[in-house]
Amino acid sequence: MSNKGQLLQDPFLNALRREHVPVSIYLVNGIKLQGQIESFDQYVVLLRNTVTQMVYKHAISTIVPGRAVNFSTGEGDEPAAA
């Protein structure tokens, strides 16, 4: 994964995890999953609802937060809003 991808993905996912923001995750096959981000790494996201599911990032099309979340990209910019 490129550094630019990590500069955006990691702070965004970490803010969602840290603030317990409910999310909808749309997979490339059209399935919609809902829950909260429990954890993530380079390849997977753990999504918690009634159970915890491991979702591979390559299967994810879109992550939609249930509310606005502020996160910093770590580049000295103002916090980015999602």
From Swiss-Prot:
Keyword RNA-binding found: yes
* Pfam families for this protein: Hfq
Report the coiled-coil segments: none
Give the GO biological process terms: regulation of DNA-templated transcription; regulation of RNA stability; regulation of translation, ncRNA-mediated
Subunit info? Homohexamer.
Family per record: Belongs to the Hfq family.
What PANTHER family does its record include? RNA-BINDING PROTEIN HFQ
The protein in question is named RNA-binding protein Hfq
Q: What is the protein's species of origin? A: Albidiferax ferrireducens (strain ATCC BAA-621 / DSM 15236 / T118)
Q: Which gene encodes it?
A: hfq
